Amino acid sequence: MKTRFLVFLTLLLSIYGWSQHQTNLVVKLDDDARELTIEQEITFVNTSDISWDKVYLLDWANAFSNLQTPLAIRLAEDFKNRFEFSSDEDKGFTDISSLNTENYIVSRPKSNPDVVILELLEPIAPQTSRSVNITYKVKIPLDDFTGYGKSSDNEYLLKYWYLHPAPFVNGEWQFYSHKDLNDFYGAPTQMSISVHVPSRLKAISSLKMITQVEQENRNSYLFEGLTSSSARLYFLESTDGFKRYSTNQVDLTTDIDDESVPTEMKVVFIDRIASFLNDHVGKSPSRELFISDKFYKENPVYGLSSLPSFINPFPAGFTYEIKMLKALTRKWVEQGISTHNRDEYWLKQGIIIHTIMKYQEQYYPNLKIGGKLSDFWGIRGFNVSQLRFNDRYAFLYLNTKRLNLDQAPNTPADSLLKYNQQLAIPFKAAIGLAYLNDYLGNNAVENSIKKLYSQSPSNSQNSRDFQKYLNEQTDKEIDWFFDYFITRHERLDWKLRNIEKYKDSVIVTIKNKSVYPIPIPIYALKNDSIVYKEWINGFIGDTSITLSRKAIQNKKLGAANRIVVNYEEIIPEFNPRDNYKTLKPFPAFNRPLEFRLFKDIEDPEKSQVFLMPDITFNIYDGLAIGSRFYNGNLLSKPFRYSIKPAYGTNSGKLVGSIGLSYEHPFQDRNNSLFSMRYGLSANQFSYAPDLLYRRGSAWLSFNYRPKDLRSNKRQSLNFRNVFVQRDRNDESLEEDPDYNVFALSFNQSDRNLRRSFSYSFGTEISERFSKASFRLDWRRLYKDNRQLNFRVFMGTFLYNDTRSNDDFFSFALDRPTDYLFDYNYYGRSEDDGLFSQQLILAEGGFKAQLDPAFANQWITTLNSSYSIWKYIFVYGDVGAVKNKGTSARFVYDTGIRLNLLQDYFELYFPVYNNNGWEIAQPNYDEKIRFIVTLDVNTFIGLFTRRWY
């Protein structure tokens, strides 16, 4: 009996002393084949109480194997086309040669081709271990796709290159595919890697180097360490760029550098950051840390390097320190807290940003985002220049909140919009932690973070564990934070509805405009100084509180003269502009009017009107130089107005526009109706020499978007009424230059990298005509980087009482008359000259000027183009045009298209059409058509599409 007990005790101690998986790898690089040959022994340790009949391995190197993997699909969704157009030789894959053995069978989940299943013929019993040997080859991809792989310098940066055990948590295996989100989640594994590379290369790793042997033909290395993330392995021609810094807390190896910062100062910064992290997060589980510049650039400090290198408005070494702060904090948290990095994305990211904010508060409390530039004349007047460094987090988060694109912090990382994944959700989570800490007091959040961190990284943690630790720190109720703030996306908003003033007290009524109850602070101010602050528990609808006059006065500052909700903007509120009420007697203003030059961030204490220089162009008015008065700032807002008076330098006339609009967002993601917009607009410009047009429009638009915000599917239903009044042209035969048109249209689109599809149909009704039209656009990108485009347009008049010789309202084959003044023509009335060659791809969409040019009965056209080399396309158009009293006319058109920047800068060269060989006819230069877009907002959309 005693012997059995000793055997059992020995086995139990060995299991608990060796609770992580272990793996030994022998890795050989074939430089010519861009291939790793790997012999791997994995010892699986089953510390659960469930037998394992199969185990899962993460094989993210195989994510590069074809265009159907989750990674390939993700890259295409983000409009990253390099992988899409790469050859098979440039991609990567894993080739497991030991497919079947006596001990296990290898397979892969259908939807996860970068995960390997080892089906064990004999299960691994609880509290036992089993060793498995696997031999395989890994084809290394080029680094063009994710930044990792073989570079053009013939060096190798390897991140996901071997088989790593997946974690087994709460009775189930947790695994997911590579999607370039830097969210690898593996089981803690003790690793030993023997690496052999050609002698021209040196190896360095995120694991500790144990031995190094350099020989004539090859260099050999041994790396060891414990990790739950993928072990990074770099093969470089020189590792001299990596420096080692030893401090009291850590020994750091890094190639993050700044030549302007002395080594001694770098050591001071690293030691200060490490000491701060040790005090506020916890002691690092490993003294040896490896942080590469590549690691930092995966999640950098956005905007820090926007200024030229010769302009440094920050304190000496600040840029280096903040880079190191971001990278070191991320490394510290990732290696010390084990969570499901995709489903619990907000938790780690929130802790990382929250810790960075605390550091900046301690060492740079008054530093502004512009540094010294914020004090320069001409810059210091802008509100944005006065933002403190920590204020940018709330500002950047509110960007998506104002666009109605906010998502709940607990949304899985792969379901987030790119902007939310990179910026908004980490920032919102961090702000939420700061908000919670202010409400609870006594450093409850920081203490809970340290408790979370103190648990062994071998123990997987989640939000429920964090909530438990918080409850241990306070008697206050905090369920609202996890039930509402973390799990909901709806906006937070309050309004200071009313103040009743009495001799000894003030009764304040606050309206909660959001859908859930969370605490809110209320303040009494003397000018801009806080006299009194009180937290109000969460409520729905309205609530009233009584503040005694005695409480809201201060011996030094005197009596308060303003009451404000959320004055310090602790909570990222949707609209703080209605949070202010004055205690001053009438006629004081709650928010005085302020005029500001150029666009800026809003000041919630004032009603702001922004003034911007504005320049437009058409050949009749010339440069229309004027000013734009509007209430729009750097963040979107529901109600907008814009007044743009201008003077035409050619016409010598007053021109311009005015617009009012309101957007009502719908926050219920289960309802596809995303927003409703309505408004009024009017403008006046020249449409011909010495002739003005005046257009007024009222419009209503319903916009639809799927629940999955990452989807590019869009729908809209639009109603508008357009009234046009034109100066009469004595040379024209028109009887009445004024008209009114009601238009109804429905649009649907799904624009993606591989395939773009959209269609619309609509109708227009006027006193003299009614018409219906249909348009379809389709584009396909092929593996060889060839592009095929189709466009179909069909239009018919339901009735047409216009004169037969007047084609102003007719369908156009190549150049729409634009009687609704929707298009940005630079010379809309030109019949010859350069500006008559401007092409607007609408209606018939032809490029050549053919006869008949218009259709007063019906028209059907098909436009197509196909790329033959890079930006050179061939195009072809065919169609039929029907006019009253004549038979339908078949038309066709072919030529060459230079697609320099699609929809923004294109040239069309007609070759052959109904007129014959255009290229052989005189005045060919007059037949070339061009597309040039000068709308900056449209151009910016080309670059922001992957973020929203």
PLM feature spans:
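Outer-membrane beta-barrel "beta-signal"
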Residues: L898, Q902-D903, D925-Y948
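Juxtacatalytic substrate-recognition/specificity segment
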Residues: I193, R218, L222, F242-L347, ...
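Beta-strand-rich binding/interaction modules
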Residues: I204-S205, L289, I478-D479, L492-Y567
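C-terminal outer-membrane beta-barrel translocator/porin domains of Gram-negative envelope proteins
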Residues: R677-A688, W699, F742-S867
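Extended, low-hydrophobicity, Ser/Thr/Pro/Gly-biased non-transmembrane segments
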Residues: F79-S98, R108-K110, V132-R232
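Acidic/His/Gly-enriched intrinsically disordered linker/tail segments
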Residues: D343, Q349-I431
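Amphipathic alpha-helical substructures
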Residues: T411-K503, V508
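Outer-membrane beta-barrel initiation region
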Residues: I518-I520, D528-I530, I536-N537, L547-K555, ...
